[in-house]
Amino acid sequence: PIDTPALEYLEILIGKGSEETDRQLYRFQDHGGRDVGMRFDLTIPLARFAAQHIHSLGLPFKRYHIATVWRGENTQRGRYREFMQCDFDTIGSLSVATDIETGLVIHNLLRALGFEEFTIRLNNREVLNGLLEKLDLADSAPAIA
């Protein structure tokens, strides 16, 4: 895992999500008077990190990250201002195998946590076509447009 800072310069965070996300940012000035915000997800800090370090990391670059994120929204059932988020990311691969690998990582994680029955949904036609080909079922399955 690669940990990224909980605080980012506000210019890194603003405009990367929706207007709603921008409104939910916890923002303030640090001791140097710079505008900063608390990360609302783990993807934007990863993108900044990758832009700075990808030349030394190599591609494809894979990582997982479990960390706290913050959102300034009204608390209600299932919605919190501070919560843990888990990301599994791959940068630099256009292969459908990456999506399949992500599903397998989720499967193995849930099994390791003791879950026996669960459903994983992947919304990618290319993944389904790839699985059908791998299982030699592509010719016998109905075409998916």
Residue ranges and their predicted role:
Residues 1-145:
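Extended, charged alpha-beta segments that form solvent-exposed binding/catalytic grooves
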